[in-house]
């Protein structure tokens, strides 16, 4: 799999777009399943995001994860935006 070199800000935007329901229809799948990052921290975040639906199962079948999982995403967004 190709290793991507995205910035912290770019990854934060992907997470925020997913959380807010913006972005393309397949952007989340592209991020979680179709990418791999050279930066270990960004790769660790991606891997954690892959498992959020199992770690924090949604009560609504139309959602990816529950509120606790969304809080994890918000935490990553805040962390990534703070670390230019």
Can you describe what each PLM-predicted range is?
Residues 1-84:
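Acidic, Ser/Pro/Thr-rich low-complexity regulatory regions
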């Amino acid at each position: 799999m190709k290793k991507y070199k995205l910035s912290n800000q770019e990854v934060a935007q992907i997470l925020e777009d997913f959380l807010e329901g913006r972005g393309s229809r397949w952007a989340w799948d592209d991020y979680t399943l179709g990418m791999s990052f050279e930066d270990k921290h960004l790769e660790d975040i991606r891997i954690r995001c892959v498992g959020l639906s199992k770690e924090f199962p949604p009560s609504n079948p139309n959602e990816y994860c529950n509120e606790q999982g969304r809080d994890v995403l918000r935490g990553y967004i805040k962390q990534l935006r703070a670390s230019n």
